[in-house]
């Protein structure tokens, strides 16, 4: 097993421990954030997924549109 594979396994374990679940429809690991507003609740979906050997963090708003995306270095996210 390569160092990259070990880092990915540790990263996935870390995000699972932080409330993410694998979501087939997004082909990545997701969790929902929710906040109260004067008009009700707003939700956003946070997704970590691997796309062509690059891990990405993607945030979707209540309307389903992407409002943030970033390529990430998984080693910076490991404890």
Locations of regions flagged by a protein language model:
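Acidic, low-complexity, intrinsically disordered interaction modules
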Residues: 21-77
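Negatively charged, low-complexity tracts enriched in Asp/Glu with abundant Ser/Thr
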Residues: 2-27
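Short intrinsically disordered terminal tails
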Residues: 1-3, 76-79
């Amino acid at each position: 097993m390569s160092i990259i594979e070990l880092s990915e396994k540790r990263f996935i374990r870390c995000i699972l421990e932080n409330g993410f679940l694998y979501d087939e429809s997004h082909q990545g690991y997701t969790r929902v954030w929710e906040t109260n507003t004067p008009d009700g609740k707003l939700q956003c979906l946070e997704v970590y997924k691997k796309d062509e050997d690059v891990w990405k963090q993607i945030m979707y708003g209540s309307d389903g549109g992407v409002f943030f995306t970033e390529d990430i270095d998984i080693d910076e996210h490991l404890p």
